[in-house]
Each structure stands twice: as C-alpha cells, then as structure tokens.
C-alpha cells in the first residue's frame, strides 16, 4: 500500500517506523531536522514542504497513493490536507488527527460524516482518552 504521512512529529515518526516494513511510505514535514532524524532511523522517503500544498502532495505521490494520514500539529492543516488530497485523487483514503473537540460536534461533524468535508476517518486522541476514562468511571472494577 502506498501511504503518505503528513507530519514527522512523534505520531508521524512512530507510524512511519511501524508501517515502513510492509508499505511504500513518504513522510512530509516542514521541519528538515525531524525528517533527517526519521531518515537516519529507517529507510523512508521524506519530502520537505507544507502538508496542504498541492504541489507538495503531487511530489509526494498523491496521484497514486492509497492513503493519506495527516498528523501535523494543526487540525486545520490536517483537515485541509485531506480535502486537497481528495481533490487530487478521489480514491485516496484520508485520515486526519483532529484534537479540537468542537470540530467533531454539530455541523462540522455532520459535514465530515456526510463527506462534505472529505475526511474519511478522523481520530481525536483527546476524545478517545475522555471516552475511555468515562467508561472506567461508569463501569468500575
């Protein structure tokens, strides 16, 4: 599977390390130091640039990518990157980390769920942790 990971922070690096054996990966980030660190750890192609820039996505191979995983530090960049990725490749599966809970409620959640905002899968670490703790409190033992 051809996967583009947008963001070379802790999550992006961990994903890249886990997936690099079985998949064709490209990691995109604006931080060249992070990318060099990743290159030293494993044999992964990297690209310096903005995650939501169409030319960077094209250079990363979006036209024939199977999946884009957007895990930058910016929710807005992650969402826009997924939107631009879908414009460039309608069949690509998009995954975005979304930390701000307000994006996952009301009209914006409806827009994501309906595909109006083309993010196929949105992952909110904060929401997952909150739900897990709430479950522990409600079902003790």
Located regions from the model:
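Cytosolic regulatory regions of ion transport systems
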Residues: 1-141
């Amino acid at each position: 599977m051809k996967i583009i990971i947008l963001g070379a922070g802790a999550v992006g690096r961990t994903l890249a390390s886990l997936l690099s054996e079985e998949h064709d990966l490209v990691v995109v980030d604006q931080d060249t130091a992070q990318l060099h660190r990743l290159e030293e750890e494993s044999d992964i192609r990297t690209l310096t640039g903005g995650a939501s820039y169409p030319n960077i996505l094209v250079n990363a191979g979006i036209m024939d990518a199977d999946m884009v995983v957007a895990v930058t530090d910016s929710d807005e960049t992650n969402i826009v990157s997924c939107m631009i990725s879908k414009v460039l490749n309608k069949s690509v599966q998009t995954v975005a980390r979304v930390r701000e809970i307000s994006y996952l409620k009301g009209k914006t959640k409806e827009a994501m769920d309906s595909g109006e905002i083309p993010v196929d899968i949105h992952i909110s670490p904060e929401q997952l942790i909150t739900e897990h703790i709430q479950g522990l409190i409600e079902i003790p033992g």
